[in-house]
From Swiss-Prot:
SUPFAM superfamilies: Ribosomal protein S10 (SSF54999)
InterPro entries: Ribosomal_uS10, Ribosomal_uS10_CS, Ribosomal_uS10_dom, Ribosomal_uS10_dom_sf
Cellular component GO terms held in the UniProt record: ribonucleoprotein complex; ribosome
Protein's recorded name: Small ribosomal subunit protein uS10
Record bears the keyword Translocase: no
Keyword presence, Ribonucleoprotein: yes
Record keywords: Ribonucleoprotein, Ribosomal protein
Source organism of this protein record: Enterococcus faecalis (strain ATCC 700802 / V583)
Amino acid sequence: MAKQKIRIRLKAYEHRILDQSADKIVETAKRTGADVSGPIPLPTERSLYTVIRATHKYKDSREQFEMRTHKRLIDIVNPTPKTVDALMKLDLPSGVNIEIKL
């Protein structure tokens, strides 16, 4: 019989919130009797933006801004219906983006 697997990808700008959310998901899945692998840290995506400070001239004066996107991966193997219901009712912070693949 083929194993059923739920793959959850989490993305956030702050790694503390991301790790707390991942811990909540792992704890909920383990409590309901599913096998969990993760959270696996994925490479951090780094975006760098360079902006001219002045409005019209002085091109040599620039400012740089950086935005980091932290990512985690969680695999839930053989989830029970109880696991799926518990994950649907789980309350996570608004700064965390969640992608779920079955």
